[in-house]
Amino acid sequence: MRRLRHREVRGPVLGHTATGGPQNGTSGCTTAPQQRPPPGTQGMLEQYLNRGGQKSHGLCWLLCFVSQGQNQDVISAELWCRIHVQAHWGCWQNSAVWGCRNEVLVSLLAVGQGLPSASGGRLPSLVHGPSHPDSQHPREVPLAL
């Protein structure tokens, strides 16, 4: 009788799932967010992520203007937050992501008002005070989008 020296391990690595699923509500990694982007940006987001751009803040601006063109309106702050969380794959606690989100929301405000700063300029007084970016938790401002 022979004894096997090496046993093949089957199944997901501890802390991860093979494909994600309802058991932990993730898409393969336990730190990934559960939210999904709106249908209009789904294909574009997946294509971008497949090219390894999941950490790129440039995706924020890309999805911003794609959504503008498809919806003919300014998307809501809540919807934008869901897109942004999905794009950054769970790094919502990262202060750099907070800053990026604030910039995007400022730009969305500018788009809605027809201001030239929608092309990427900042209007910091609308979103955070002078303590940013040193602040760990930038002040939230209610947006009527």
Curated annotation (Swiss-Prot):
Residues 1-41, 122-145 are annotated as: Disordered. This is Putative uncharacterized protein B3GALT5-AS1. The lineage of its organism: Eukaryota, Metazoa, Chordata, Craniata, Vertebrata. Residues 134-145 have a biased composition (Basic and acidic residues). It comes from the Eukaryota. Residues 20-34 have a biased composition (Polar residues). Ubiquitous.
